[in-house]
Amino acid sequence: IPLCLVGSEMCIRDSPLRMNHLQMKGTHNSYHVEPIFSPTREYMYTHQELGVQASDLGVRQFELDVWWDVREGLRVYHNQYDSGTTCPTFQSCLEALLLWSQENSQHHPIMIWVEPKDWLEQGAEITTTVELTGILQEIEDEITQFWPANLTITPDDVRGNALNLTGAVLDEGWPLMDECRGKAMFVLLATGDMRDLYMDERPGLVGAKMFPMFTSQGQYPGEEVIFSLTDPITDGEE
């Protein structure tokens, strides 16, 4: 809303909106379908399909659990006891959101939180561990393949000509809202070894498709711009 001085032709406008000025409605396990036989009350809920969440419910932040299957590639579900999903593959989840996005090209930017999952897989005769670097690269590859580059907000976009990502955000700010409409930002929802592998393979996040998530400052100075603070009492001041 413009602020104008009474009796003057001068009108001072508020600073233009940037990405970080938004508050978004989000869903956790955004793909989830209640199992027929639920082992716990925590699984007893069903989300609308992703496109319906965006169009009818105003959701702009989505969270996807991504598993790697040796036969079927990247799958999306909660766990082996809670596997109901509205979009069984990472590709189908991206396609559902992209369809809505392209039909509503002026929408506020959406955030897609991607949580890679790994576990010991029991084979017929051997036990193998899914290689973390492999699933991370496959996720990157499918984002590249199934979400247009010109509709993706990447670390390179935010960094611009600055020396690092944190410096760019502190000095220049997040991208303007008008530059982000119709686009998506992908966030790597991982800590520990998974996040470290992702960042070690992509020094300075150059060429990365996802923004890593942090829970505190000082872990990767220069690249920390997305934080998850989930305790309003403990984290209130931050």
How would you describe each model-predicted region?
Residues 185-238:
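C-terminal active-site rim and adjoining tail of enzyme catalytic domains
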Residues 30-35, 71, 194-197:
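Short, solvent-exposed loop/turn elements at domain surfaces
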Residues 6, 17, 57:
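Structured loop/turn residues at beta-strand edges in well-structured enzyme cores
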Residues 13-43:
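Boundary/entry segment of secreted carbohydrate-active catalytic domains
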Residues 41-44, 87-91, 233:
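Conserved phosphate-coordination/catalytic loops
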Residues 1-12:
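Single conserved hydrophobic/aromatic residue that forms the stacking wall/gate
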Residues 48-51, 56-61, 66-189:
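Metal-dependent phosphodiesterase/phospholipase catalytic core, i.e.
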Residues 44-54, 232-238:
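Short, acidic/polar
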